Amino acid sequence: MIISESLKFLKKENKVLYWSGWFNAALFMLAFILFFVDDRQIMSINAWIKPMKFALSVLIYVWTFGWLLQYLPAKNKVSFISWGITLCMIVENIAIFFQAARGETSHYNISSALNASIFSTMGIFIGINSVFIFYTLILFFTEKINLDQASLFAWRAGLFLVLVGGAAGGMMVGNMAHTVGAPDGGPGLPFLNWSTVTGDLRIAHFFTLHGLQAIPLFSFLFASKTSKPMLYNIVFFVCYTGACVALHLFAMLGRPLFS
C-alpha cells in the first residue's frame, strides 16, 4: 500500500522519472526472461545477469531522484535534471544490453574499435550524469528547500555519496578492471558476482552509490523518531561513509570480502 501510494505521488510529481523507472522495470523483466532462454556466458556468468543488475539499479536510482526532486521549487530545473538523467541512463542501458546480445563485455572492453567506442560513450554519459548529480547537490544548498534540517542533511549526504561512488567508479576505469589481485571473471557471489577470491572494488562502489537511499531512509525511519535527529543522521553518515572507505581499502589490498 505504501509503495502504491508512493508511486502515485511520484507519477504526479515527476512523470519523466516515473516512466523512466517503469522502462527500467521492463528492461529488467526482459533480461530476466532472456536469462532462461539464452545460456551464453560472459566472463563466467550468464550474459543477461549484468543487464538485469543495471536495470534494477537504474530503476531504484531514477525513482529516488524523482522523489528528491520534489523538494526543489524551480520546476524548470527539475525538468532539466529529470530529462538529463533519463537520457544518460537510456544510453547506459542500451550499451549494456547491446553488448550482452553480442556476447561482449560492456565495461573495460577496448578489444575492437566498436567495443572501445561503446565503452567510451558509456563513460561520457556517466560523466554527464555525475554533472547532473553535482548540479542537484548545489541546488540543495542554494535553493530554498522545504525540509527540516535533519532531512535536508540526509539528502545532501546521499547526493554527496553518489558523487564519491562515481569517483570510485572512475578508479575502476583507470584500473580497467573491477578486481584487484586477479583478472576479472573469477568465482563470485550468486547474481552480484562480487569476487570471492580477491579484492573487488564494486562492493564499495555499490554501497557508496546507494547511500542516496540509505541515508534518507535511515533519517525517515529512525532518526526522525528521536529527539536529536540531526545528531543521529550525522553519526550514521560518518559510520556509513567510514564503512564504504574501509570496503574500498580492503579491496585495494586484494582481499576478498566474501570467501
Where do the language-model regions lie?
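Glycine/small-residue-rich hydrophobic helix-like segments
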Residues: 184-233
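Interfacial segments of alpha-helical transmembrane regions
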Residues: 77-85, 144-165, 229-237
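Early transmembrane hairpin module of multi-pass membrane proteins
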Residues: 5, 14-126, 204-215
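Transmembrane alpha-helix/helix-exit interface in multi-pass inner-membrane proteins
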Residues: 161-184
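Structural signal for the C-terminal ends of transmembrane alpha-helices
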Residues: 65-72, 137-146, 219-226
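Juxtamembrane boundary at the C-terminal end of a transmembrane helix
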Residues: 249-259
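Active-site acidic/histidine clusters and adjacent loop/turn architecture
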Residues: 126-135
